[in-house]
């Protein structure tokens, strides 16, 4: 097995060998990790462990990859706040209502509002944002907001090897994966 990408740590080599013994194809994990200098972000050196945050800034976390550019373009970052609802006027989003760090309700008017609160938080805010012009919740004329949620659960497996494999280094959840069992197949006993 030859993993010729930047995350070719020993644990990935062992997993690639196991996949190949079983006849499974494997791929390098798609990772938002830079392998060279990019702004304030340094290239990955596989120092690990990525799941606890990257001490070099190689991992594309929101604070390094998006906020600096957004704030340079005029975005304002309000921390320790919880959005309670999205405000609309005549079927147009005009801002948000939030609770600030002191527990006070604040209103922020904005020309643009980006809603990115994951599958559950986004639906929650859309439903909490019901108003006269959207009585069933914002963007919910179909009554489907908050329904048909689909999760992509994952499993974490830890292995013990006879030799040292640097298992703590590189991207979280190793650096290769296989989708041999991605498609539904009732003959395997599960869907």
Task: Go through each PLM region and give its residues.
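Glycine-rich loop(s) and the adjacent beta-strand/alpha-helix scaffold that form part
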Residues: 56, 72, 81, 86-87, ...
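Extended catalytic-interface subdomain
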Residues: 168-191
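Short alpha-helical segments and helix-capping/turn motifs at coil-helix boundaries
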Residues: 11-15, 63-64, 143-144, 160-162, ...
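Aromatic-residue-lined binding/catalytic grooves and analogous aromatic/hydrophobic interfacial grooves
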Residues: 62, 91, 174
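Conserved redox-cofactor binding core of oxidoreductases
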Residues: 1-83
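Redox-cofactor-proximal catalytic regions of oxidoreductases
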Residues: 1-2, 47, 162, 179-184
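A short, glycine/Asx- and small/polar-enriched loop/turn
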Residues: 38-41, 88-94
